[in-house]
Amino acid sequence: MTETTNERSATLIDLAEIRGAASLPVVSFDRHELGAILRVYGRMVAAGEWRDYAIDTLRDRAVFSIFRRFSEMPLYRVEKTPKLARKQGAYSVVAAGGLVMKRGQDLAQVLRVFDKSLKLVDD
């Protein structure tokens, strides 16, 4: 008695080989950068001004978006764009309308745009 079997075999494909040079590394925030951003974020959440955030890692930049409510457009975006590091600075804070509020080489300096300024109060 001879049995015939229909075997189907799967072919494994290494996606890294297929993508090859087309898969460029993505830009992301390192641990220290993310820590600095989250310190400012935590302070503003405690003050009741911000409620949510999102992190996007793209090929040319990393974006930390800040929301009052998640269903809205972001109030601010903290962006890291390495290709601008030698020109205008890798870090920037962008307002909802697209206005660049602060740009620079040092993330801590750029994040100071969120510090509340002291105001003189008349008696």
Language-model regions, residue ranges each:
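Long, non-catalytic architectural segments outside compact domain cores
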Residues: 2-3, 11, 117
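Negatively charged, low-complexity tracts enriched in Asp/Glu with abundant Ser/Thr
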Residues: 7-63
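Short aromatic-glycine-(Arg/Gly/Cys) micro-motifs in beta-strand/loop hairpins
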Residues: 13, 78-98
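Amphipathic alpha-helical interaction surfaces
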Residues: 47, 72-73
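Basic nucleic-acid-binding interfaces
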Residues: 53-63, 67-72, 85-86, 96-97, ...
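Short amphipathic beta-strand/extended segments with alternating polar/hydrophobic composition
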Residues: 74-82, 100-107
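Mixed-charge, glycine-accented linear interaction segment located at domain edges/termini
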Residues: 92-121
